[in-house]
C-alpha cells in the first residue's frame, strides 16, 4: 500500500437508510441531514467546506428546481464554489471525480458532494425516463431504461448462448448480501425460482431483476489525504458516447448492447491507478447495477472474468461475500436505488469497507484497494473509480 498525503481522498461519507418513502423529511432536510453527517465523519466543520456539488438525476424526480442554490448560505465566502452535476445515475461518481480535480489543483480544500431522491416527490419517473431516448434515431421504438436493458439482456443471451436464468444469479447473491445491510431497502433473500417467477417488466427482465423505486440520500467529502481514515482516490476512468437503438444506422456511432464502454472506462481507471491485474489487486468491487444484466456486463468489462461467464462464476460461488473478490457485498442497487444518490452509495459502501467499518457486510481487506462503478442515462456515461488505503 502506498501512503501519500498530496492526493485527493474521501475524507467523510454518510448515507441514510433506504426506504420506499421517507415522509418525515422534505428534500432540503434530507440533503442537509446527510451532508452534515458526512462533514462530521470527515472531522470537519461546516465552515471548512469551500465547495459544494449536488449530484442529480432528472429534475422531474426531485419536485424542485435548481436545488444546488440552497447551499449558498452554508458556504464560507466569496471564494467558495457550488454546482450541479447531472449525468443521471452516474452523477455521484462524476461529481466526486470533479471534486477530486478541484482539490488536486488547489481550487478547493474540502468539497462536499451530496445527492438525494424522494420517491413520492416530483413527476413520474416513468415519464422522465421515457424522454431520454433520441427521437431521430429511435423513432417510435418504446425505449426507456427498462426496455433498453431488456435489449442488452437478449443480446447477451444470443451472443453467449445463455438462458434468462443467468440474470437471476446476481439477484440471489445480492439479496443475501442485502439481508446483512441495515441500510438496504430490500433485505429479504430470494431464490432463483422466485426471481424467474416474478412479473415480466420487459422480457427477459423480471421485476425482481430490477431495482426498486427508492428514497434515500448520500454524501461524500473530498479533500487531501491527510488522516488515517482517508481513502485515497487512485484513479478515475470515464467513457461517454452517443448510444441509440439506431446506432448502426449512424456512421461512427456504436451499439450500447455489448457493454464495451465499461471496458474503456476501466482501462483508463486502471492505467491512472497503475493497475495491471485487477483480479489480483482488488479486495472487492461495488458496481452500479439497477438491472442484473448490468452486473454481469460490469464484472466482465472490469476484467474480472471472460465475457459470458459472470453468471456461471456467481453460481459457483465466485464474487460472493467471503470469496476472493466479492461484488456488491452490501447488496447493490437491486436492494435499494435512490437514482441521484446511487453512485454515492457505492462510494460510501466502498469507503466503509476499506476502513473496516462495514459491520456485518465487511469483507477481508488484503490489498487495500477497491473499484466502484456507475452508469448514466441509457448507457451514455460510464464511470470507474479506484479507491485505496
Which sequence ranges carry the predicted segments?
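Conserved active-site "lid/cap" helical segment
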Residues: 1-90, 98, 156-163, 185-194, ...
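Condensing-enzyme catalytic core mediating Claisen C-C bond formation in acyl metabolism
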Residues: 1-28, 169, 200-264, 268, ...
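Conserved catalytic cysteine-centered active-site region
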Residues: 4-5, 56-114, 118-137, 141-148, ...
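Short acidic, glycine/serine/threonine-rich loops at helix termini
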Residues: 22-24, 64-65, 97, 122-127, ...
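Beta-strand segments within the central parallel beta-sheet cores of soluble alpha/beta enzyme folds
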Residues: 46-56, 81-87, 111-116, 165-172, ...
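Short glycine/threonine-rich loop-to-helix capping motif typified by GTGT followed
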Residues: 59-68, 245-249, 289-311, 378-385
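Active-site-proximal alpha-helical scaffold in enzymes
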Residues: 86-117, 146-180, 220-226, 335-359
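Extended C-terminal subregions enriched in glycine
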Residues: 255-263, 267-292, 296, 301-304, ...
